[in-house]
């Protein structure tokens, strides 16, 4: 995009202050503690509607204040506009956010890549392939809805899983991997059970919203 701004790089306005509930604060503190000490991967586990994204955005905001960048992966291209708006409203004023997916034009991708190498991007929001982007001073890789099968590529080659690439990258860049979902994959659940991965749990929904009522109906008729 010679002579004009790259429309796939947004600037945050920081309009909304992130106020966490007590439950969210506990999860946020667990992530901060791991980042400050062991840098073990953390699983942010909470029901749909618990506000996991706000916990992650608050942590990303802290990293930006320290001069560190984040890569945030979502499973579907359709989710990027919604998250892009959230990032622009919640991240610190002036933070630069790059959007990366298969819909990003090649010219825009070149501009994003050059900006990443120059260290002028604070956060990347993208789908699976964004896991390979060269974020300067990487602080965190976050994979939202970690259990989703779209994070695994089998064809075309090379085959890879974004979760495994994230774990490898953070181990070589003094960063932290954070996974989030209401329904962890069996692989991550096993790592939590073995204490390879730490668990940051949010017990209920944000704003004291109630959980759905579950009923199991009888689908048979008694035999007489």
Task: Locate each region found by the language model.
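SF2 helicase catalytic motif II
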Residues: 129-178
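A short beta-strand-to-loop transition that corresponds to the Sensor-1 phosphate-sensing loop
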Residues: 76-77, 120, 126-129, 145, ...
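Flexible beta-alpha connector loops of hexameric P-loop NTPases
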Residues: 98-106, 148-160, 222-224
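Conserved helicase motor "Helicase C" RecA-like lobe of SF1/SF2 P-loop NTPases
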Residues: 80-96
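Conserved motor-coupling elements within RecA-like helicase/translocase cores
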Residues: 86-90, 100-124, 135-138
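Conserved interdomain linker/interface between the two RecA-like ATPase lobes of SF2 helicase motors
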Residues: 25, 168-224
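Glycine-centered short loops/turns at secondary-structure junctions
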Residues: 67-68, 119, 174
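Pre-Walker A segment
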Residues: 1-50, 54-74
